[in-house]
Amino acid sequence: PSSTRKILPGLYLKNFQALESIIKLAQENKIKILMYNVPIRNDVKIPYKIDDYSKFKNDLDYLSKKYLFKYINLENIVPNNLWAEKTSTTLSNETEIDFMHFKEKGHEILAENIYFEIKKFWKDVN
């Protein structure tokens, strides 16, 4: 990655407060929640501070336990060879690793995992 992104504490807090409000609203309206942590490429250094990224995942897990909804971590389900590359953001014009997008097969894997969890989750709550 060309840079390491850090958590901005004020924005992070506001975003999590907003997320918590959405969770409460969903539950008030009897909407089932399945939250997942998105896939991320894991064969190279990720563009986030590891401590910040771990905190984020732990905070999602905490919310799932507090509000009793299903949370799954899918960060490692897309194989590294299925991640996309992007055009350079520097003067070098070399392609760069894209941490946000993966190829079609990666989307199929993600969809299959989410579908499996939804089927299992809805079966468990009905």
Residue ranges and their predicted role:
Residues 53-126:
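Catalytic His-Asp segment of secreted/periplasmic serine-dependent ester chemistry enzymes
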